[in-house]
């Protein structure tokens, strides 16, 4: 009887873990200093190898920084004392289609664009409190005081 209950439960937990892994839109590659990631009131300490998903905010403290890689190969380097939101992160590796909107609320971010910006530059944008940047280049920096 225990086997009948435990085995399906274990399989369910494994499937949930696989789905959580698939939900990742990117991975933290480097973290220096105090960096947190999350949505709303649910913040966690950022660690190299940790995942990021759509709607996550990356918050860096004074002197801190974070580098993350998205599924399409886009690299984001978030500078010190910054707040960056991954507003829309969609990329289908099969069709090579998607949409990327990054909202820089404070601080600086360097972006090295990936596959999505190369194939569909109109689908990639960086917004700030006062502007919207359409991405046409491959490597640039945006700063918000």
Question: Residues of each region from the PLM?
Answer:
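Absolute protein N-terminus
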Residues: 1, 20-21
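N-terminal signal peptide c-region/cleavage motif recognized by signal peptidases
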Residues: 15-17
């Amino acid at each position: 009887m225990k086997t009948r209950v435990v085995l399906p439960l274990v399989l369910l937990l494994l499937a949930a873990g696989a789905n959580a892994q698939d939900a990742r839109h990117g991975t933290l590659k480097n973290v220096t200093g105090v960096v947190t990631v999350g949505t709303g009131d649910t913040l966690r300490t950022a660690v190299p190898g940790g995942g990021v998903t759509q709607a996550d905010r990356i918050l860096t403290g004074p002197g801190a920084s974070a580098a993350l890689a998205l599924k399409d190969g886009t690299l984001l380097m978030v500078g010190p004392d910054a707040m960056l939101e991954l507003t829309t992160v969609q990329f289908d590796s099969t069709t090579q289609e998607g949409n990327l909107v990054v909202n820089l609320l404070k601080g600086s971010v360097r972006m090295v664009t990936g596959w999505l910006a190369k194939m569909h530059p109109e689908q990639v944008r960086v917004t700030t409190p006062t502007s919207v940047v359409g991405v046409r280049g491959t490597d640039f920096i945006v700063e918000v005081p």
